[in-house]
């Protein structure tokens, strides 16, 4: 039987679930909570693929229903609630960051119901400022457009809400795919060593030698502008860094005594990597995902700002910045609001990433 150990002692104050709090009833609810999280994650991802219209509608409703159920269960279940409260007391900035991310995801899920207007609709405001004929460049506080309208009369608030859908989807999909691929390659490279490890590291060095935005621009020029191509380009950028970090951690773990003992008795290498090394790099995997999420959102916004990201007509925070750039002197709100949205999400994921790193890495506890 495989034995899973960690080489560090977990901090009792930050223990996720204490055994005393788990009763037969709560264990069933915990299983239901876990299933709800999984259902929401899957439906959230699939809902952005643009499948058959009726199926897309069903999947979106599943995501909309599972999100509040998940949040209610998190508040009701004592083990989950106590863990969140401990995290809030110990890492308040990280907890605030988590709230901002949840709000951003909720904005994405309920965008069609929260946004006051169609993001591409024109002439939605009634303003005396700006151009009252075409109703463009209406300032913030305008009736029908609380954050104003843009250069062709579209509601800035509605475009900001729908822009969260693209930014969060691209960011989350990128880190999920990129960090997962990097983890698999990093563990395999560290454990195998030899020629395979050398080849992987040379490829990693070559890809990391390019500035990220330059590499992304080159890939988008080759692939063409689309949401999925943006995800592919960002995955290519993230995989080398994730591979290097996970490989470094896996090299340390594979020299632990119990893993050396497993190897000495002829345990299957794949089994060792999956049952012994992988569980010990999960903490690093989670921290990498949160830290790189902000980076992915910024790069996606940069590509949209440069006009090579998502197709024209799809509202994104980056494309809103590009539109506002030409009118920044007189209509500054066109860049202020999307800029605030990007900054808020990036700061939130960085705060959350730092907090999770401090919690999950025993070497950093107490700082």
Can you describe what each PLM-predicted range is?
Residues 1-179, 183, 187, 296, ...:
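Gly/Trp-centered helix-boundary motif
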């Amino acid at each position: 039987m495989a034995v899973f150990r960690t080489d560090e002692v977990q901090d009792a104050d930050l223990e996720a679930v204490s055994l005393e709090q788990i009763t037969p009833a709560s264990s069933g609810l915990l299983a239901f909570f876990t299933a709800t999280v999984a259902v929401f994650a899957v439906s959230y991802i699939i809902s952005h693929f643009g499948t058959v219209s009726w199926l897309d509608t069903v999947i979106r409703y599943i995501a909309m229903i599972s999100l509040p159920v998940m949040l209610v269960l998190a508040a009701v279940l004592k083990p989950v609630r106590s863990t969140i409260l401990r995290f809030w007391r110990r890492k308040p900035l990280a907890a605030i960051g988590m709230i901002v991310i949840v709000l951003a995801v909720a904005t994405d899920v309920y965008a069609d119901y929260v946004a006051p207007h169609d993001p591409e609709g024109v002439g939605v405001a009634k303003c005396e400022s700006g151009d009252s004929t075409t109703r463009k460049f209406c300032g913030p506080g305008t009736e029908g457009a609380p954050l104003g309208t843009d250069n062709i009369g579209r509601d800035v608030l509605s475009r900001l809400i729908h822009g969260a859908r693209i930014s969060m989807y691209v960011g989350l999909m990128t880190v999920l795919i990129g960090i997962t691929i990097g983890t698999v390659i990093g563990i395999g490279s560290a454990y195998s060593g030899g020629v395979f490890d050398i080849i992987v590291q040379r490829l990693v060095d070559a890809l990391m030698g390019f500035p990220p935005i330059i590499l992304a621009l080159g890939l988008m020029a080759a692939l063409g502008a689309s949401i999925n191509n943006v995800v592919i380009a960002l995955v290519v950028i993230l995989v080398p860094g994730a591979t290097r970090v996970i490989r470094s951690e896996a090299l340390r773990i594979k020299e632990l005594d119990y893993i050396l003992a497993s190897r000495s008795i002829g345990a299957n290498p794949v089994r060792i990597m999956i049952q012994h090394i992988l569980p010990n790099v999960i903490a690093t995997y989670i921290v990498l995902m949160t830290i790189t999420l902000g980076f992915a959102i910024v790069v996606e916004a940069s590509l949209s700002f440069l006009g090579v990201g998502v197709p024209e007509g799809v509202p994104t925070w980056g494309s809103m910045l590009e539109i506002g750039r030409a009118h920044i002197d007189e209509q500054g709100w066109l860049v202020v609001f999307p800029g605030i949205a990007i900054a808020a999400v990036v700061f939130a994921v960085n705060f959350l990433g730092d907090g999770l790193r401090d919690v999950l890495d025993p070497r950093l506890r107490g700082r």
